[in-house]
Curated annotation (Swiss-Prot):
PROSITE patterns: HISTONE_H2B. Residues 1-10, 40-50 have a biased composition (Basic and acidic residues). SUPFAM superfamilies: Histone-fold. Monoubiquitinated by the UBC2-BRE1 complex to form H2BK123ub1. H2BK123ub1 gives a specific tag for epigenetic transcriptional activation and is also prerequisite for H3K4me and H3K79me formation. H2BK123ub1 also modulates the formation of double-strand breaks during meiosis and is a prerequisite for DNA-damage checkpoint activation. Acetylation of N-terminal lysines and particularly formation of H2BK11ac has a positive effect on transcription. There is a cross-link at K8, K9 (Glycyl lysine isopeptide (Lys-Gly) (interchain with G-Cter in SUMO)). Belongs to the histone H2B family. There is a cross-link at K137 (Glycyl lysine isopeptide (Lys-Gly) (interchain with G-Cter in ubiquitin)). This is Histone H2B. GO terms for cellular component: nucleosome; nucleus; site of double-strand break. PANTHER family: HISTONE H2B (PTHR23428). Transmembrane segments: none annotated. Core component of nucleosome. Nucleosomes wrap and compact DNA into chromatin, limiting DNA accessibility to the cellular machineries which require DNA as a template. Histones thereby play a central role in transcription regulation, DNA repair, DNA replication and chromosomal stability. DNA accessibility is regulated via a complex set of post-translational modifications of histones, also called histone code, and nucleosome remodeling.
Length: 142
């Protein structure tokens, strides 16, 4: 069996989302450049490596809740890490639930059950109500 490829670990720095980049995707906000191998005699072309973060969305929510408040890079990195961790936990639990029921598709029901299992008490109730509201809004917009 071939060895598994190494997983990329996100770096601990996430930049502030500037007000002018509100229309950009989160991956476009933070990019690295790496050199691609080139043939002899030709210039090396820099390729962009995408780094996906939730920084833009965290910044937008912050501005909706507290328009005059800023956020440091370190705080943004912590929040980004938190969102990624919760997302991964919910996705893993939903995947397990789908496999227990011999289904190959994760539906909103599996996500809802995963949230109930992962988040405690009142927090899960609020998360489920907000999720249901978002799904309803999305469905009605089609």
């Amino acid at each position: 069996m071939p060895p598994k490829p190494a997983e990329k670990k996100p770096s601990s720095t996430a930049g502030k989302a500037p007000a002018s980049s509100a229309g950009k995707a989160p991956a476009e906000a933070a990019k690295k450049t790496s050199k691609a191998p080139a043939k002899s005699g030709e210039k090396k072309k820099a390729t962009k490596v995408r780094k996906e973060t939730y920084s833009t969305y965290i910044y937008r929510v912050l501005k909706q809740v507290h328009p005059d408040t800023g956020i440091s890079n370190k705080a943004m990195a912590i929040l980004n890490s938190f969102v990624q961790d919760i997302f991964e936990r919910i996705a893993t639990e939903a995947s397990k639930l789908a496999s227990y029921n011999k289904k190959s598709t994760i539906s909103s029901r599996e996500i809802q059950t995963a949230v109930r299992l992962i988040l405690p008490g009142e927090l899960s109730k609020h998360a489920i109500s907000e999720g249901t509201k978002s799904v309803t809004k999305f469905s009605s917009s089609k």
